[in-house]
Amino acid sequence: MIKVWDYLKEYELLREDILSAVDEVFKNGTLIFGPKLDEFEEKFSTYHECKYGIGVGNCTDAITIALKAFDIGAGDEVITTSNTAVPTVTAIVNTGASAKFVDINQYSLMDVDRLENFINKKTKAIVPVHLYGQMCEMDKIMELSKKYNLKVIEDCAQSLGATYKGKKAGSIGDVGCFSFY
């Protein structure tokens, strides 16, 4: 078997730092919330050039929370791409909304030339999924979101550090949702 990632080699390099950080969290009794979360949120949002950063359990939770914050639910439709993982769709369904799927372009990302055909009066949001370190064509997505007054929630689970025209993943739409997948 060919390993894609040899995490043991990386772990050995970082072992002392990892164990020290875990030990500090447990000694301080701040496993949930606390100064390490505050530090992470600050550093993560600064890196992505965003005003806020809120740590949650995973990208599914982040997308669900974002959709609910925009009052998206039963009877609403959310457009995403057909080439996504189950968690993206799970987040949409968790709100009671229906997912509508736009096909992909030659780069395996949302085909923005087909996007407008899926927008109707029930559409409330677009969830573009940035994949493989590549970002969707955000100019067109943002143009359509303004035209139809839609929210844009970027699924950035596989695009940490990616950029589109100098802007980082998660910093273009209304909300960017990440994971450490």
Language-model features: locations:
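Conserved active-site segment immediately N-terminal to the catalytic lysine
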Residues: 154-181
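Generic hydrophobic alpha-helical segments
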Residues: 40, 63-66, 115, 141, ...
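N-terminal "arm"/small-domain region of PLP-dependent enzymes with the aminotransferase-like
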Residues: 1-30, 35
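PLP-dependent aminotransferase-like
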Residues: 68-156, 163
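Phosphate-binding glycine-rich loop
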Residues: 30-77, 91-95, 101, 167
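Structured loop/turn residues at beta-strand edges in well-structured enzyme cores
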Residues: 20, 48, 73, 121, ...
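PLP-dependent aminotransferase class I/II
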Residues: 8, 20, 35-43, 47-53, ...
